């Protein structure tokens, strides 16, 4: 009987498992509830201070951001809105002046016709040609692929939307290839003039955490950030009338003063109101709560 048991592989595995070290306990992630009250009681003073710092409106976002690139004389309303969408798609992880230059090259490629979905397709550019045109935009090949896919989709009328028009809903924009939440809320605001949500980019995500407006920074994995979490937390308490303003306000502030590394706290007009002021380190975040 004992010999038979020794020949049964299942028993030997079970015996080995008994001697194996116990698996480490699974660490549960604590979810931070979305706040409905301002986490930072001085947020109004902070925002007013940033407005003062940004009074000159001479940051890159002010002359090369999506709002600045919106040209009402650049074709029909459909063309203008399409160009806003293009600038948003080009902008991901790309500096504003590079985005602006890329959009202008797309406009020139379509001339004398205004830049629109059908006009861009009519140039006959394939993915490789458009990739070359977009250089040095970041992730140019992926963006060229998505742009052509979007053009082919928008050039045809569908679901009550006329040919050449971009979707006028959050859901419709999110269905487009390469278009995420950040781009969607920016396009809804700039192209359609509708305040549907906060556009949270790397500047808004970083500075909101530094100011104490949210506590959403991934300290364990700094390269794995979640701007969508920041958007939801900001929208939980920030009055809606500030949603449209907060993107350009913080983006320009981040471009000129509150840099990703080594922020210029000594030259900042709100350092006395900032819990992260003069903290040393790569990101200068406030103490962990």
Per-range role (PLM):
Residues 83, 87-90, 146-153, 165-217, ...:
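Catalytic DNA-binding helix-loop module of base-excision-repair DNA glycosylases/AP lyases
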Residues 1-166, 241-242, 249-257, 261-289:
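N-terminal polyanion-binding entry modules of DNA glycosylases/AP lyases
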Residues 120-134, 173-174, 225-235:
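Short, well-structured alpha-helical segments that form the helix of a local strand-helix-strand
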């Amino acid at each position: 009987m004992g010999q038979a048991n020794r020949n049964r592989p299942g028993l030997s595995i079970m015996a080995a498992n008994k001697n194996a070290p116990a698996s480490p306990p699974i660490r549960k992630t604590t979810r931070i509830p979305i706040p409905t009250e301002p986490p930072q009681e001085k947020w109004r003073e902070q925002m007013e201070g940033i407005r003062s710092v940004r009074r000159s409106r001479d940051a890159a976002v002010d002359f090369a951001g999506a709002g600045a690139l919106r040209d009402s004389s650049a074709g029909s309303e459909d063309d203008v809105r399409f160009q806003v969408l293009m600038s948003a798609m080009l902008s991901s992880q790309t500096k504003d002046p590079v985005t602006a230059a890329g959009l202008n090259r797309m406009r020139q490629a379509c001339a004398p016709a205004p830049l629109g979905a059908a006009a861009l397709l009519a140039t006959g550019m394939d993915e490789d040609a458009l990739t070359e045109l977009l250089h040095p935009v970041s992730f140019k090949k992926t963006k060229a692929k998505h742009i052509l896919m979007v053009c082919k989709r928008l050039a045809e009328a569908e679901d009550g939307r006329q040919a050449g028009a971009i979707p006028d809903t959050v859901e419709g924009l999110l269905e487009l290839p390469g278009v995420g939440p950040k781009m969607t809320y920016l396009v809804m605001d700039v192209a359609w003039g509708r305040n549907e949500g906060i556009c949270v980019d790397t500047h808004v995500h970083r500075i909101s955490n530094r100011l104490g407006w949210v506590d959403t920074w991934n300290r364990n994995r700094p390269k794995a950030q979640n701007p969508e979490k920041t958007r939801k937390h900001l929208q939980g308490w920030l009055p809606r009338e500030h949603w449209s303003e907060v993107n350009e306000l913080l983006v320009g502030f981040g471009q000129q003063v509150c840099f990703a590394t080594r922020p210029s706290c000594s030259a900042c007009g709100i350092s006395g109101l900032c819990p992260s002021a003069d903290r040393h380190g790569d990101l200068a975040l406030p103490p962990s709560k």
